[in-house]
Amino acid sequence: MQRRIMGIETEFGVTCTFHGHRRLSPDEVARYLFRRVVSWGRSSNVFLRNGARLYLDVGSHPEYATAECDNLVQLVTHDRAGEWVLEDLLVDAEQRLADEGIGGDIYLFKNNTDSAGNSYGCHENYLIVRAGEFSRISDVLLPFLVTRQLICGAGKVLQTPKAATFCLSQRAEHIWEGVSSATTRSRPIINTRDEPHADAEKYRRLHVIVGDSNMCETTTMLKVGTAALMLEMVETGVPFRDFSLDNPIRAIREVSHDITGRRPVRLAGGRQASALDIQREYYTRAFEHLQTREPNVQFEQVVDLWGRQLDAIESQDFAKVDTEIDWVIKRKLFQRYQDRDNMELTDPKIAQLDLAYHDIKRGRGVFDLLQRKGLAARVTTDEDIADAVNHPPQTTRARLRGEFISAAQAAGRDFTVDWVHLKLNDQAQRTVLCKDPFRAVDERVKRLIASM
């Protein structure tokens, strides 16, 4: 499948600092965030004009699921649009607090752990064909995903009673299974719950829940681009060495704690390989695969960065990637503060900086400040993100959903939508079922809109 439907779901951490004596719980702060949404959508679970889904997930975490995208830059742009949508709700909620005499600053973090040790996720979705053995995909993908944090981890300072350690991944400590149908109880690497949101006879949806939430656009593009390439190679029968892991859950933690990538990981059957070895094998296959498939500039950029990051890890000289990979950017930032102020990783200021890196509010968040200074690379523009806040991708089913929602809202009509259904809640209860996520034009939807 050379054209693939992809999407990213991001849960955001919420906290609030209050100016007066009145205090609100995280649940109450989250409800303030969603008041404007509930006022027009009559629910805290809505679809937006840009085709995305916005809702309040378990544990008071706002969640934004991008619309269906079919290329990498489009997906990164719509992922960033989610940050802007949430930031807009943040500003509105702070004004509501002020109007009610509850002064406070709300913070939304695009990260994966809070100070209490709770974890929330960034889930990737990839459409795959129903035909073929799912176990073949999961067998190849598990070692890839366990070691992928080398190239696209968000970075984290892990505080223990004895010391502090810089880790590659925020999510690695919170994963407890390899492949499972659960998402919250056991937190697997790959979720097997079969909800394709498409024609179930043709497709299924690969749901990856092991990844970190990335701030840097190039890291997000690398994360989804390498996974999409891996799927494409598995589907076309590219042979891979067997890197089946003896214990994926132990391995994912071991990899996260080793920024050299050289620590041996135990494979099934008693063999060993380093995370760097495993990633290098996948990179080499991807590089060769690009020579045989039709040209794709975005995949070429992904494979180029993949190779440069592996070279940087091998040499431990990160100068050529220190604006493109989240954990490298963050580690460099920490080292600068440590050198300047002679502080240890255990210093509370480092923990504060670690959190502030993920603050999505422009002009306040540390990552945004780095990006404005040119210290974090981009693949989108602010103009494209602003457009994605208001308009769906034009090449997928999301276009139909977005146009239907816009028309229904403009006409003041009562409607219901989900990923596959568009419904007018009138006497006729007219519904259009959109089972093909690749289809951006549909006469049935045009007629439904024209009837409003």
Swiss-Prot record:
* Positions with a binding annotation for Mg(2+): E9, Y55, E63
Active-site positions, per UniProt? D57 (proton acceptor)
Recorded coiled-coil stretches: none
What does the entry list as the binding residues for ATP? R53, T66, W419
InterPro entries assigned? Pup_ligase, Pup_ligase/deamidase
Please verify whether the record's keywords include Zinc. no
GO BP: any one term:
modification-dependent protein catabolic process
Enzyme Commission number(s) from the entry = 6.3.1.19
Judged by the first EC level, this protein's enzyme class is: ligase
Q: Which Pfam family, any one, appears in the UniProt record?
A: Pup_ligase
Q: What else is known?
A: The reaction mechanism probably proceeds via the activation of Pup by phosphorylation of its C-terminal glutamate, which is then subject to nucleophilic attack by the substrate lysine, resulting in an isopeptide bond and the release of phosphate as a good leaving group.
**Function statement:** Catalyzes the covalent attachment of the prokaryotic ubiquitin-like protein modifier Pup to the proteasomal substrate proteins, thereby targeting them for proteasomal degradation. This tagging system is termed pupylation. The ligation reaction involves the side-chain carboxylate of the C-terminal glutamate of Pup and the side-chain amino group of a substrate lysine.
Could you tell me what this protein is called?
Answer: Pup--protein ligase
